[in-house]
């Protein structure tokens, strides 16, 4: 997880006309408010926390800082819903729960947009 966060730290955010920026403002105020809502709820939740990012600024554009949410609940709302903003939610599963966690990725969203596995074990990555 720490390697992943290191890569998030390297993401450059700014104006769309600067092609060195990887993330720019979200499309409109409604999208900004939606992203901010997810972040605010994660900050207040007992089963989730914002471990990186979480800042939002709409003074010049609708900028949402790349944000990492860590949850202990595999069915936490941002695990099951497509946010359309620079927010990712991480659920760390126990090795013994791999099959059940894989099934969660397959069943959480009808659109299959929300699940991904990151693993050091090549066998796990092949499944």
Stretches found by the model and what they are:
Residues 6, 41, 104-107:
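Residues within well-ordered alpha-helical secondary structure of globular protein domains
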Residues 37-45:
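Helical element adjacent to the flavin cofactor pocket in flavoenzyme catalytic cores
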Residues 4, 38, 125-127:
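Aromatic/hydrophobic pocket-lining residues that form π-stacking "cages" and hydrophobic walls in ligand
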Residues 5-37, 55-63, 77-85:
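Flexible, acidic loop-helix segments that line cofactor/substrate-binding pockets
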Residues 1:
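Conserved NAD(P)+-binding/catalytic subdomain of aldehyde/semialdehyde dehydrogenases
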């Amino acid at each position: 997880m720490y390697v992943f966060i290191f890569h998030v730290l390297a993401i450059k955010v700014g104006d769309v006309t600067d092609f060195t920026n990887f993330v720019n403002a979200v499309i409109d105020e409604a999208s900004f408010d939606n992203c901010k809502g997810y972040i605010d709820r994660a900050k207040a939740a007992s089963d989730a926390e914002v471990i990186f990012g979480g800042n939002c600024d709409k003074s010049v554009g609708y900028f949402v800082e790349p944000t990492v949410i860590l949850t202990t609940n595999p069915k936490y709302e941002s695990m099951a819903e497509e946010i359309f903003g620079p927010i990712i939610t991480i659920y760390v599963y126990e090795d013994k729960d791999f099959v059940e966690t894989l099934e969660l990725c397959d069943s959480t969203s009808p659109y299959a947009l929300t699940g991904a596995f990151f693993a050091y074990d090549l066998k796990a990555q092949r499944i």
